[in-house]
Amino acid sequence: MTVLQEPVQAAIWQALNHYAYRDAVFLAERLYAEVHSEEALFLLATCYYRSGKAYKAYRLLKGHSCTTPQCKYLLAKCCVDLSKLAEGEQILSGGVFNKQKSHDDLVTEFGDSACFTLSLLGHVYCKTDRLAKGSECYQKSLSLNPFLWSPFESLCEIGEKPDPDQTFKLTSLQNFSSCLPNTCTALVSNHSLSHRQPETVLTETPQDTIELNRLNLESSNSKYSLNTDSSVSYIDSAVISPDNVPLGTGPSILSKQVQNKPKTGRSLLGGPTALSPLTPSFGILPLETPSPGDGSYLQNYTNTPSVIDVPSTGAPTKKSVARMGHTGAKSVFSQSGNSREATPVLVAQTQSSGPQTSTTPQVLSPTITSPPNALPRRSSRLFTSDSSTTKENSKKLKMKFPPKIPNRKTKSKTNKGGITQPNINDSLEITKLDSSIISEGKISTITPQIQAFNLQKAAAGLMSLLREMGKGYLALCSYNCKEAINILSHLPSHHYSTGWVLCQIGRAYFELSEYMQAERIFSEVRRIESFRVEGMEIYSTTLWHLQKDVALSVLSKDLTDMDKNSPEAWCAAGNCFSLQREHDIAIKFFQRAIQVDPNYAYAYTLLGHEFVLTEELDKALACFRNAIRVNPRHYNAWYGLGMIYYKQEKFSLAEMHFQKALDINPQSSVLLCHIGVVQHALKKSEKALDTLNKAIVIDPKNPLCKFHRASVLFANEKYKSALQELEELKQIVPKESLVYFLIGKVYKKLGQTHLALMNFSWAMDLDPKGANNQIKEAIDKRYLPDDEEPITQEEQIMGTDESQESSMTDADDTQLHAAESDEF
């Protein structure tokens, strides 16, 4: 018995798209047993991989000669997932034994999937410490497909500084069309007799606003007339993969049920649009064409007051009347930016000389409620009468209202959202040009151009959004945290109020040691996306600094219940027990985080700080070195190594590691502060004061920096300057015992014994056991000249005060933790 391949393939893709992986695997195994082809092999391996069985896909593909680009890419993907990096590299680029393939060779071999191939190869290079080659692969991947975000993200994380303005742009229609799925280009090609893309190169403005070139409309009448073959049937892409079953292959056995279904549209970048107030200005792609007797299929465009009439094979038409409908709110993906103004859309109503049951004008339904058998999309549908027909060549279109122009209020909103004013003007020029084309009665001539043109317009809005987000993320990876907060805070509200953006802002506040603000942002993330795990390790550390044990306990419980395979959840649990001073349990949880993800650098760092607290310095050194091995730009681990060497009084090594951390994060006042302390220990007191002054310039209210500067001044016998510094510090941290203790020592040196005793008494009252300091690094004996002090309790505090028992009610020791002080 022979199994027909195409129906089985369609059934497999339908099962995959409905997450019925067991059914998909079973059918794919039957198909591969019947047809031993590369296509069936790839389909079976895809089923294995999507069902989470990468090792099965790897062994299947490894046991057969993979010659097609699809199979090669999937095999390489499996190798990377299984940590077989060398094998994955050899599959993609040739490796050591074969000739190394260039980027152009990869583009030629893999075609449209070359951008993903290069991104995967770049990941392999970066994991094997070949950052320069990895950077080249990422950049080439982005040049092929600017819609990819992860290559840009990876470039920022390895220390590169890609220019978002040059990265997220579209240079031509040809380049743009290569980034889209086959179904998108099929929309244009299937509507033309020649089945060709228009050879139109779209010029680029600084913000990717495209102006339509002067087209020779008369000469193109014969090339781009719009006719639709009635035998063409669009098949739901959720049922059949476009790579295996072309959309224009005739009526499908899988789409019989669509005969009585209202005409629906699928939202995609650009194209004709019929939008609800809740959806972005993406277009509606037809999922099926009208039947020969049904000419009610309508198309309309946002920002383009035109009617795109699809000819019907039914009775001849007489006349066409244009009606106005309104779309709802436009999103950032529309070319005119974040305008909330409604834009008029033309909806054509036609009358036929043939039999018809109704002459009621068909208008765009404002509701967003889909019929029961429609696809579950939020975008609104076109509901039209089954009996009306569409005119084939409309010569006269009447506009009842002119299109609205964004008013002053809209412009101000647009500018705030990061979409510049020239975009609006260029968009209006496009609209005017489209209007003039319609008035000349040549709409059927340039329909393919307009369709591609609207795809480009919608994509330009997405590019503008990605540019702004890219600038914010680049600033954050460069530790320009204030700039990152400013850029991300000016994103459109509906993008700002998402988990990813808020997590980046929360992380920026965390790096600035503004823990109260960070906690506020992260709590908002938890409110709007309670399922988000990414970034919650930073939230847990924030709560640790703020000593909010209840909130931290709730967070860790929720995360571990939700996903026991995420390292973030176990880091939160470890922080929870660390706050309770249960260091042994915390160590076990941090080790569990590493077990779950051995490439998670932050877990190594937290574990290292925990070992420091238990005085297991050798284990702590190993943890910090592992963190650096996983991520050389993880400055927290460099800081941890510096702290250990400082404890061991290896001051030169400590300074070197602190300096390495500062090279990664030059905006950290805490790192500068520690470098100043080490320099003073190396008898470089003047240089230490300069370094501490730089730290205070960056953060004038950093109590740790001011405290250390006062200590250095005191050690250099500049008592009056030290006293002035301590009086200012007392205003910032009025309940810090060590401040009063050092003030007492200054007064004693000045010979004012009564004031010295008074401050010593206050220090004892504030901290009778020396266990509740807010500034963890106390005065070290090496700071002070040799003298006999009657207060011995505070002397004990000096060398031992590096525990986690601090009360974080003021913004003091938070500064220390911003650079991962003694813990993180």
UniProtKB/Swiss-Prot annotation:
Biased composition (Polar residues): 252-262, 297-306, 363-372, 381-391
Residues found modified as Phosphoserine: 291, 339, 380, 387, 427, 436, 439, 821
Subcellular location, record wording: Nucleus; Cytoplasm, Cytoskeleton, Spindle
PTM entry text: Phosphorylated. Phosphorylation on Ser-427 and Thr-447 occurs specifically during mitosis.
Alphabetical list of InterPro entries matching this protein: TPR-like_helical_dom_sf, TPR_rpt
Biological process per Gene Ontology, one example term: neuron projection development
Basic residues biased stretches: 396-414
Stretches for region Disordered: 251-273, 285-325, 346-423, 781-824
GO terms of molecular function: protein phosphatase binding
Cellular-component GO terms for this entry: anaphase-promoting complex; centrosome; cytoplasm; mitotic spindle; nucleus; spindle
Gene3D superfamilies the UniProt entry points to: Tetratricopeptide repeat domain (1.25.40.10)
NADP keyword on record: no
TPR repeat residue intervals: 84-114, 115-148, 499-532, 567-600, 602-634, 635-668, 670-702, 704-736, 737-770
Entry superkingdom: Eukaryota
Pfam family, one: TPR_8
Keywords, in A-Z order: Cytoplasm, Cytoskeleton, Nucleus, Phosphoprotein, Repeat, TPR repeat, Ubl conjugation pathway
Modified residues (Phosphothreonine): 205, 209, 313, 367, 431, 447
Biased composition (Low complexity): 349-362
Subunit: Homodimer. The mammalian APC/C is composed at least of 14 distinct subunits ANAPC1, ANAPC2, CDC27/APC3, ANAPC4, ANAPC5, CDC16/APC6, ANAPC7, CDC23/APC8, ANAPC10, ANAPC11, CDC26/APC12, ANAPC13, ANAPC15 and ANAPC16 that assemble into a complex of at least 19 chains with a combined molecular mass of around 1.2 MDa; APC/C interacts with FZR1 and FBXO5. Interacts with RB. Interacts with FAM168B/MANI. Interacts with MCPH1.
Similarity remark: Belongs to the APC3/CDC27 family.
Function: Component of the anaphase promoting complex/cyclosome (APC/C), a cell cycle-regulated E3 ubiquitin ligase that controls progression through mitosis and the G1 phase of the cell cycle. The APC/C complex acts by mediating ubiquitination and subsequent degradation of target proteins: it mainly mediates the formation of 'Lys-11'-linked polyubiquitin chains and, to a lower extent, the formation of 'Lys-48'- and 'Lys-63'-linked polyubiquitin chains. The APC/C complex catalyzes assembly of branched 'Lys-11'-/'Lys-48'-linked branched ubiquitin chains on target proteins.
Protein name per Swiss-Prot or TrEMBL: Cell division cycle protein 27 homolog
